[in-house]
Design a protein with these regions (language model features):
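A short SAM/SAH-binding and catalytic strip from SAM-dependent methyltransferases
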Residues: 113-129
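A short glycine-rich, Lys/Arg-flanked "PGG" loop and its adjoining helix->strand segment in the class I
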Residues: 129-146
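Class I SAM-dependent methyltransferase SAM/SAH-binding core
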Residues: 43-45, 49-104
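Conserved class I S-adenosyl-L-methionine
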Residues: 148-170
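Short conserved loop adjoining the S-adenosyl-L-methionine
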Residues: 103-110, 127
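SAM/dcSAM-binding transferase cores
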Residues: 13, 168, 175-219
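Class I SAM-dependent methyltransferase Rossmann-like catalytic core
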Residues: 1-39
Length: 219
């Protein structure tokens, strides 16, 4: 049975829900990233963007939003429509694409990007596909780009260690880490899916090769 993603997003209406905590965590990191970058132009891509509020709400509140070129990829028609309506209501110019974020064609003209959001992707694919996605991420990134991703903590196992190692193997440096569930509950109850948020920065040459790097840790 396929997931009703619009019903899944209903949890965001509760400010104390795990999803709402995760969104606030992601939004803090997006805002900090924008503060840290003084570029005149920045390119952002959000895969499986849902209603796009994690990014769009941040942009709507910023006077420097015009320097951001944002592309949102979302397959669900209702969620894509909600993102478009929010963007229009707040005079945000974004490229909203109804398409499969798992195909390279969907990113045509939008990458390489300075910020790549993989929020909600890693908990909804197989482990093999997750590994392959991380391996492909350098192709979506400019030199020094940032990747923000989220992953739930599941009763069947926590892939945090493996995911961090996979990122490191592709030349990414972990910048910061946030676990909203830990702040709110102190621990993750067995059987519950609790969100982790990671922020990795890509360090690579202008060529296609990927090289590891050292840097600050913020997440």
């Amino acid at each position: 049975m396929s997931t009703d993603w619009q019903a899944w997003h209903a949890a965001y209406a509760d400010p104390d829900s795990d999803l709402s905590r995760r969104r606030r965590s992601v939004q803090r990191q997006i805002a900090q990233w924008l503060d840290d970058r003084n570029d005149d132009r920045l390119r952002v891509v959000s895969a499986c963007a849902g209603d796009g509020r994690d990014l769009l709400e941040v942009l709507a509140a910023r006077p420097d939003r015009a320097r951001v070129t944002a592309t949102l990829l979302e397959l669900d028609e209702g969620l894509a429509r909600a993102a478009a309506e929010f963007a229009a209501a707040h005079d945000l110019v974004v490229d909203l694409r109804r398409g499969d974020a798992g195909t390279t064609d969907s990113y045509a003209g939008a990458v390489p990007a300075d910020l790549v959001q993989m929020c909600g992707v890693f908990g909804n694919v197989t482990d093999d596909d997750l590994r392959a996605t991380i391996a492909a991420l350098p192709q979506l990134c400019t030199p020094g780009a940032t990747v923000i991703w989220t992953r739930g903590r599941f009763a069947t196992g926590d892939l945090t260690g493996e995911i961090r190692a996979w990122f490191g193997g592709e030349g990414f440096e972990e910048v910061t880490f946030d676990a909203p569930w830990a702040r709110s509950t102190g621990s993750a109850p067995t059987g519950w899916s609790r969100p982790h948020v990671r922020w990795h920065r890509a360090r690579r040459s202008s060529a296609s090769s990927v090289s590891p790097a050292c840097g600050r840790s913020r997440w």
